Amino acid sequence: MNKIISNPPFHIISPLLFRLARKYFISDTFELCVLIVQLDYAKKMCAPPGEKRSRLSATIQYYADVELLSIVSRKNFFPPPEVDTAIVRLRPRRTKHMVDFSSYERTVRILFNMPNKTLRKVIKKYFKDRSPTILEQLVQRKINVRKHVRELSNMEIEIIADLLKEFLD
């Protein structure tokens, strides 16, 4: 399978996207995924680092280019749903990743449990006694530990994941 086009039930979108990322977006043969999702969800998927950034957007954008193609009004359906929808296209990124999916996903899960906290606070909470060593190494790698988690770019998260994989095993 190299293409997916679907209008999945809204309640399975998150698990579906994480499964697609884990199984297909890292494949050399997978080309394209087009989905109809809730408009708010589409906006989360496309969110740049900042206010709306989430575990979902950080993970999906790391493995795929996400593009909101079109907004579809609820009036176009019968019976009309309670929310507007959007058509989203995802194309796998063909870049070499520093870390495997599992390490990246574990790091994102830890970080985005507290998206409004600074990276420094998250590291201190999760890694307690080892946090001074980790924070020092992050600073050496030019990562601003005073930045809020939701403001981190995918490249910064990748650098953090690369460092944390030795502390998570």
Spans of features found by a protein language model:
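Class I S-adenosyl-L-methionine
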Residues: N2-I5, I12-V149, D162-D169
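Short helix-start
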Residues: E156
